[in-house]
């Protein structure tokens, strides 16, 4: 059915003939009568909304299934009605669109939950409940009248939203016929009586009154830019679409016969009325002549210079590069008309079997009106000097008349396809497929099947996807109390007992070691002890010493140490001393491995260490951090904390992140046994303070309580 030719059945159904219309004089309803009509429809819809509240997912799915079958059963009749009433498009192609709306859309909706609890996650504690958005106003265009009615009715029924339609005046009767088919099937399947309604008054005032009615919850606007803008101006949620000016970039690596077939198939479908159809083919110069030969095989007519001017004049009221070309505006009479009719009206003739009229253009933009959206079987052809030029022309075309809509590319180079996608401000990038079918989804790709194509903020739309039932539900969320995970994190390796510093002799992967400490550690001979152990290794290790750490180390000292590290390039950093030396070494480690880190970023406060605004980078890629304490109390050797002073501001900044947790902690009591009594007592008070604070902390746990109580016990057992 997708490959049916445009000639088939035309004579029997009048697919390419302008329907004869006899003017019927009718009394124009007053504004008061129109308002009353709209009020009546909305009140009935609100009642239907109440009735829908008690429906189950199974009932809703049954209704949608029966409506889909009814649409399928009438797809040909509705297509015939649309062609005869509007005088536009092709019968069998409109039949295909009706089939698409019934079959592809319903298949996409089949497993979608839209009623009640749709998701319950015991892990996160989130329960999601789907509710209808309310009464929907559905705007229906003349380009796809019956298929749009079917599509919007199905997604409204799936979500338990009553819908009230405003049909385009030139497609009112065929749209109404489609609405009756779906409504009657829905009611027969158990839906509320007024689940689908429509305005019987054909006027802009009636449409505006409906869109602005306080009982309308949201608007599904498919139509011209003016109608979509009006929908968005109503002060309520609206799902509108923008104009499409779809370029098809034919890149030199493409499979040319397939690309040409796709473009002709897509552009000729329903006489080019789908907004996602190609408006221009931009062809690389390397394959330009081959492209021209190939496309002429498909009943495509290329206009000459004089015919191009006539075509521009008829379609846009201005010739290319003329004085008034900037004011060019599409003649609405050409939309959806066959190529032969367009040529005849423009003042020249083409063969009766012509599928598409092609015109070679020099550039994209106002000077070439045929590079605008045309919604007819007329295609601009442009030559690209290079890949960059082809992408630039495609991007310019989208920005010129179709921001946010769609763009197509035919290529075998996926990197070029990605580059094309980055460059074009189009929501849908269709690769190696007819853009008409690629844009509406589910035929050549996995896009959501839809006849309402959102264009995002590029096209001043509220949705940047193919509109579907997911856009017509409110999702309420129940958030169960779910306490944060608690955790205990220590260095991967903690060594203790007397002379445990011998681990430095046996550990693997040490070639360059930098010791960070203070001058007293040198004077007491502690540094020499560390160096002696390292020299006992089987391999030679280069050792660098930084002993300028002061009490309450400053950021300036840290930067001096970092500079030395960058020159020496250690693979092991050994912090020896009290809290000051270990804190300074941790921050040196951070800045050595990540020169881009800014102190102003890492010093910021936080509420949750796992959710802080600035994320510390992962450490250990260049060097391991080994902390060897020589006093008790701070515990810096096993914690993610470091306190650094900014002397210019005279402030201390506690830095905290699990990235600062040392790689290895060596707690060797040999270093604290020789402390003077007074200093040992001072550090004991430090231990006691930290232990009590840990025990009463709101972050205390069964793991930390044991350590805290044991620390308190040791203080009272061994200090007087």
Model segments located where?
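Conserved C-terminal structural/oligomerization subdomain of aldehyde/semialdehyde dehydrogenase
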Residues: 20, 49, 53, 348-484
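Rossmann-like NAD(P) dinucleotide-binding subdomain of oxidoreductase/dehydrogenase enzymes
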Residues: 117-258
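Short, Lys/Arg-enriched N-terminal segments with co-localized hydrophobic residues
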Residues: 1-17, 484
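Carboxylate- and glycine-rich phosphate/diphosphate-binding segment that chelates Mg2+/Mn2+
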Residues: 640-720
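N-terminal Rossmann-like NAD(P)+-binding subdomain of aldehyde/semialdehyde dehydrogenases
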Residues: 13, 18-127, 155, 297
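ATP/NTP phosphate-donor binding region
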Residues: 485-572
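Glycine/threonine-rich beta-strand-loop-alpha-helix active-site module
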Residues: 178, 556-670
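ALDH superfamily catalytic-core signature
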Residues: 22-35, 150, 228-365
């Amino acid at each position: 059915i997708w490959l049916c030719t445009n000639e088939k059945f035309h004579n029997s159904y009048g697919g390419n003939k302008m329907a004869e219309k006899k003017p019927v004089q009718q009394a124009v309803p007053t504004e008061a009568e129109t308002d009353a009509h709209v009020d009546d429809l909305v009140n009935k819809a609100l009642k239907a909304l109440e009735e829908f509240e008690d429906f189950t997912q199974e009932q809703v799915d049954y209704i949608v299934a029966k409506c889909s079958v009814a649409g399928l059963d009438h797809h040909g009749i509705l297509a015939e009605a649309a062609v005869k009433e509007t005088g536009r498009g092709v019968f069998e192609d409109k039949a295909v669109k009706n089939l698409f709306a019934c079959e592809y859309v319903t298949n996409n909706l089949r497993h979608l939950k839209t009623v009640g609890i749709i998701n319950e996650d015991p892990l996160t504690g989130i329960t999601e409940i789907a509710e209808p958005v309310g009464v929907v106003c559905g705007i229906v265009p003349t380009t796809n009248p019956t298929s749009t009615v079917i599509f919007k009715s199905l997604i409204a029924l799936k979500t338990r939203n009553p819908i009230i339609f405003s049909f385009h005046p030139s497609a009112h009767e065929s749209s109404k016929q489609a609405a009756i088919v779906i409504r009657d099937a829905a009611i027969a399947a158990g839906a509320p009586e007024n689940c689908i309604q429509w305005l019987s008054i054909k006027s802009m005032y009636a449409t505006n009154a409906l869109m602005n009615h306080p009982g309308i919850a949201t608007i599904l606007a498919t139509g011209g830019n003016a109608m979509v803008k009006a929908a968005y101006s109503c002060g309520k949620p609206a799902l509108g679409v923008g104009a499409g000016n779809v370029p098809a970039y034919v890149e030199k690596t493409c499979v040319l016969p397939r690309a040409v077939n796709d473009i002709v198939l897509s552009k000729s479908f329903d006489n080019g009325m789908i907004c996602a159809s190609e408006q221009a083919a931009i062809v690389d110069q390397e394959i330009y002549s081959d492209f021209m030969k190939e496309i002429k095989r498909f009943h495509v007519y290329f206009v000459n210079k004089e015919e191009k001017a006539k075509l521009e004049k008829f379609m846009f009221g201005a010739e290319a590069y003329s004085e008034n070309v900037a004011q060019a505006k599409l003649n609405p009479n050409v939309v959806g008309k066959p190529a032969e009719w367009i040529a005849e009206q423009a003042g020249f003739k083409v063969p009766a079997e012509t599928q598409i009229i092609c015109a070679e253009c020099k550039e994209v933009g106002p000077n070439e009106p045929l590079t605008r959206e045309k919604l007819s079987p007329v295609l601009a052809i442009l030559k690209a000097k290079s890949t960059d030029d082809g992408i630039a022309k495609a991007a310019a075309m989208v920005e010129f008349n179709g921001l946010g809509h769609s763009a197509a590319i035919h290529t075998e180079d996926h990197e070029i396809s990605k580059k094309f996608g980055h460059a074009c401000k189009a929501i849908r990038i269709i690769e190696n497929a007819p853009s008409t079918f690629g844009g509406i989804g589910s035929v050549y790709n996995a896009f959501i099947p839809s006849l309402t194509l959102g264009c995002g903020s590029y096209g001043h739309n509220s949705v940047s996807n193919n509109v579907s039932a997911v856009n017509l539900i409110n999702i309420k969320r129940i958030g169960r109390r779910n306490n944060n995970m608690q955790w205990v994190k220590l260095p991967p390796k903690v060594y203790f007992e007397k002379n445990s510093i011998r681990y430095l002799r046996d550990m693997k992967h040490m070639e360059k070691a930098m010791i960070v400490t203070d001058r007293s550690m040198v004077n007491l001979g502690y540094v020499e002890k560390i160096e002696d152990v390292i020299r006992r290794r089987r391999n030679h290790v280069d050792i660098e010493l930084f002993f300028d750490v002061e009490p309450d180390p400053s950021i300036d000292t840290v930067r001096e140490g970092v500079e030395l590290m960058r020159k020496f390039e250690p693979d092991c950093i050994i912090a020896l001393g009290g809290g000051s030396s270990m804190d300074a070494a941790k921050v040196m480690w951070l800045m050595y491995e990540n020169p881009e880190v800014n102190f102003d970023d890492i010093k910021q406060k936080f509420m949750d260490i796992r959710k802080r605004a600035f994320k510390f980078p992962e450490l250990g890629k260049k060097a391991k951090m080994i902390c060897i304490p020589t006093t008790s109390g701070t515990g810096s050797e096993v914690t993610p904390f470091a306190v650094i002073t900014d002397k210019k501001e005279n402030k201390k900044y506690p830095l905290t992140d699990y990235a600062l947790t040392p790689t290895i902690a060596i707690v060797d009591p040999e270093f604290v046994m020789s402390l003077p009594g007074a200093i040992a007592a001072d550090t004991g008070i430090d231990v006691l303070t930290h232990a009590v604070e840990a025990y009463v902390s709101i972050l205390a746990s069964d793991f930390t309580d044991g350590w805290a109580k044991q620390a308190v016990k040791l203080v009272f057992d061994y200090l007087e």
